[in-house]
Amino acid sequence: MQSIPIKNVGESRLVDPFQRQYYYLRLSITDQCNFRCTYCLPDGYQPEANKPSFLTLKEIIHLAQAFAEMGTEKIRLTGGEPTLRKDFISIAESIANIDGIRQLAVTTNGYRMAKDVADWKQAGITSINVSVDSLDPKMFHQITGINKFDDVMRGIDRAFEVGYNKVKVNSVLMKNLNDKEFEQFLAWVKHRPIQMRFIELMQTGEMDSFFDRYHLSGQILADKLLKNGWTLQHKSHTDGPAKVFTHPDYAGEIGLIMPYEKNFCASCNRLRVSAKGKLHLCLFGEEGIELRDLLQSHEQQAILQARIFAALQGKREHHYLHIGDTGVRNHLASIGG
């Protein structure tokens, strides 16, 4: 069994061969989604017959405890759409109460926010990311396949009402679809404490033609921001991959996630676990390392942690998107994007 380094205060025991420390776990709790986004699940969620069920609450707790003991400080609940789980609140409460977990985030399509966000806050969710790919209701419907724009907007407003100081909003940048709305998004965050994050469209196995048609480099937006007085901010050790820009005249912020940028992987600090219990070292990587067999009792914790650490020693220095290698993933919904 490979030895795991002793953790000092403020350090993670999860260290890869390139000395990157991992403080952040993206945990998918379901593959199911009720939206049909063109860049993710254009045909809607298709359940796979005779496949394992999603991780149980008990298994999720064992997993989160193991990662927390190894230095993970932030867990993000993803999907699919994580709030479709009937035990979503129980999952959030359980993780929020684990020693060492300082941040518990959720990425959601926002369709339940207006009704449920107060319960999320009470359960211990500290931050929310909402997907809003257009501020035009018709374009929103075209991209998501669902006519829920007004519901999502009400949910964002409700999040501020119940006490969230900031909401992060994700938009997948697509040429000739929503790229013309950049100025509209800027106006939207002028007086709202929203971090508006534009995510470059990423190539996946079954979406090659879509990528070729709609991909647009985020560097175009970065250049525009810098030209107009926006300033790039320093990242903390638990932050995600976004480059965040601020402006003294704006209450909100702009984030850019540009996976094709040089050195994108140099600051990687996050691992992923799928809804069925596989560890993924990279969004564009391998088939995954099975963890579920070691999530059945607390007595398995040391073996579980050793398996996680050993797997991490096989992490690549960077992805290979720049040469068209998208890994084995046909789409990103199965491991939370």
Swiss-Prot record:
Q: Which InterPro entries match?
A: Aldolase_TIM, Elp3/MiaA/NifB-like_rSAM, MoaA, MoaA_NifB_PqqE_Fe-S-bd_CS, MoaA_twitch, MoCo_biosynth_MoaA/MoaC, rSAM
Positions bound to GTP: R26, R76, T107, K168, R270, L271, R272
Required cofactor names:
[4Fe-4S] cluster
Q: Where is the Radical SAM core domain?
A: 17-243
> Could you say which residues bind [4Fe-4S] cluster 1 here?
C33, C37, C40
Q: What domain of life? A: Bacteria
Q: Which UniProt keywords apply?
A: 4Fe-4S, GTP-binding, Iron, Iron-sulfur, Lyase, Metal-binding, Molybdenum cofactor biosynthesis, Nucleotide-binding, S-adenosyl-L-methionine
Q: Is Nucleotide-binding set as a keyword in this record?
A: yes
Q: Where does [4Fe-4S] cluster 2 bind?
A: C265, C268, C282
The protein's name is GTP 3',8-cyclase
Could you read off the lineage of the organism from its UniProt record? Bacteria, Pseudomonadati, Pseudomonadota, Gammaproteobacteria, Pasteurellales
